Design a protein with these regions (language model features):
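Active-site region of glycoside hydrolase catalytic domains
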Residues: 2-44, 87-88, 97-470
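Active-site-adjacent substrate/metal-binding segments within catalytic domains
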Residues: 25-100
Length: 470
């Protein structure tokens, strides 16, 4: 749809950027922090691990001052469960409480709205040894952890995210790392874990609304629209299959308190449906998220299944993520979109399409919590980083977001990935996302000096203008 005039971004729009604890903080064994599953996973030997990362733990004041200089109105970061409750439950680590209090207070000092992710892939390893999310005890452990956060930070933090990319953890478990020994859970076990996460999330949202009545809370999922490869009706059915299984079922359980009927039929047919205990379906009802947080990177194009093993293939550029499932869907190429050097589809129009679908389905405000392009940035001798490709990527996505706002989609804010360079899970510091360059490579920490990229100055101007020239 074309418009004679585009709507402006809201005056209170949360222009921000994002990080996660394990990718930015470092200090993995300092001040009482215990190991998380991320710390204990088998890590590629040729890329940086998370032990130092970008050393945000020791440099948060410097970093947040830079975020303020860039003009950020919001900073989305995650809290490491292992810093707060090193044993998963029980005794609270006061050093951990103090650190995040300091981060939040530093944000407030610059009028930056903290947006807190409670769980970003990094389950305490001590809980994993007891079965992790497959163990129903982890549900109550998460509720206990959440209560500690709400007690200490509920009066300071308005916007909360429960679980980051639950759908990625369930559908592509190898994407966040391999357990020691390299064996991934079965599909049935993964969907049992998913059910327990859903229960934990519902309980925490209800607790939040009781303890922090003025706050806002939502799930943070990786959402994307699916295109059928052709106008063949079977391709359209396959695209809908994957859209439901990858996206809508995860949001439906949170927003509507029940499984999507197509997803439940799929789970039952394949004998991978979770075991349901008395009261589970009642627990899922009434979570009442206040908004949907959405991570968006690319779209997918889907063809009808051929019903054999050829339906499954590795996603281009990422061997950790398999696409396609026998009898459900198969991936297809889209000749109308570009790809990054890592094989990720670049589709800004698909961003608008996805926003329209999400808002139409759930009628809740949307907060973008990740969106960005990973690239091999180069630090020039004069200290400049010319990342025009990042400016182009974000500019196009912001324009499509403005079109979506004009379409009637209610947007809370935009927190792209990432505020500062972080450790990419599989490519280390070869693949960078930040507006701020961290001068280190895979194994040479150098001085970890910060440099402002060209995109830093560009985004600063966008924020100053409230996106009026996008």
């Amino acid at each position: 749809m074309h418009y004679s005039k585009l709507k402006d971004f809201p005056q209170n729009f949360l222009w921000g950027a994002s990080t996660s604890a394990y990718q930015v903080e470092g200090a993995i064994d300092e001040d009482g922090k215990s190991p998380s599953i991320i710390d204990m996973y088998e890590h590629p030997s040729d890329v940086a691990d998370f032990s130092v990362a970008s050393d945000h733990y020791h440099r948060y004041k410097e970093d947040i001052a830079l975020f303020a200089e860039m003009g950020l109105k919001a900073y989305r970061f995650s809290i490491a469960w292992t810093r707060i409750l090193p044993n998963g439950t029980g005794k609270v680590n006061e050093k951990g409480i103090e650190f995040y209090n300091n981060v939040i207070d530093e944000c407030s000092k610059y009028n930056i709205e903290p947006v807190v992710t409670m769980y970003h892939f990094d389950l305490p390893y001590c809980l994993e040894e007891k079965g992790g999310w497959l163990n129903r005890d982890t549900i109550e452990a998460f509720v206990e952890y959440a209560k500690v956060l709400f007690i200490h930070y509920g009066s300071k933090v308005k916007y909360w995210l429960t679980i980051n990319e639950q759908n990625t953890m369930i559908l592509h478990p190898g994407a966040i790392g391999l357990p020691k020994g390299g064996k991934l859970p079965s599909k049935k076990d993964l969907y049992q874990q998913n059910h327990h996460m859903m229960l934990a999330q519902a309980k925490v949202m209800k607790l939040f609304h009781n303890m922090v009545p003025e706050g806002k809370i939502g799930p943070a999922l990786n959402l994307t629209a699916m295109y059928p490869a052709t106008c063949n009706p079977n391709d359209a059915i396959a695209a809908h299959n994957w859209e439901v299984l990858r996206c809508w079922n995860f949001v439906d359980v949170c927003a509507f308190g029940k499984y999507h009927p197509l997803a439940w039929s799929y789970l039952k047919d394949r004998n991978i449906a979770p075991e349901i205990q008395d009261g589970d379906f009642e627990t899922l009802k009434g979570a009442n998220p206040d908004f949907i947080a959405m991570n968006y990177y690319s779209t997918a194009t889907i063809a009808a299944s051929k019903g054999d093993a050829s339906d499954v293939a590795a996603r281009a550029g990422d061997q950790q993520i398999m696409l396609g499932e026998q009898g459900v869907y198969r991936p297809s190429e889209n000749p109308y979109v570009e790809k990054t050097q890592y094989g990720w589809v670049v589709d800004s129009v698909g961003f608008r399409y996805t926003l329209r679908k999400v808002y139409e389905r759930y009628q809740l405000p949307i907060l973008i919590t990740e969106n960005g392009i990973g690239a091999n940035d180069t630090l020039e001798p004069d200290g400049c980083i010319h990342d025009q490709y990042r400016i182009d990527f974000i500019q196009k996505h912001l324009h499509q977001m403005r079109l979506a706002i004009t379409d009637g989609v209610k947007m809370l804010g935009y927190c792209p990935w990432a505020a500062i360079d972080v450790v990419s899970t599989h490519q280390g510091y070869k693949k960078r996302y930040g507006f701020i360059y961290v001068d280190r490579d895979e194994f040479n920490l150098k001085e970890l000096k910060r440099y402002k990229k060209d995109s830093f100055y560009w985004y600063k101007q966008v924020i100053e203008e409230n996106g009026k020239n996008i």
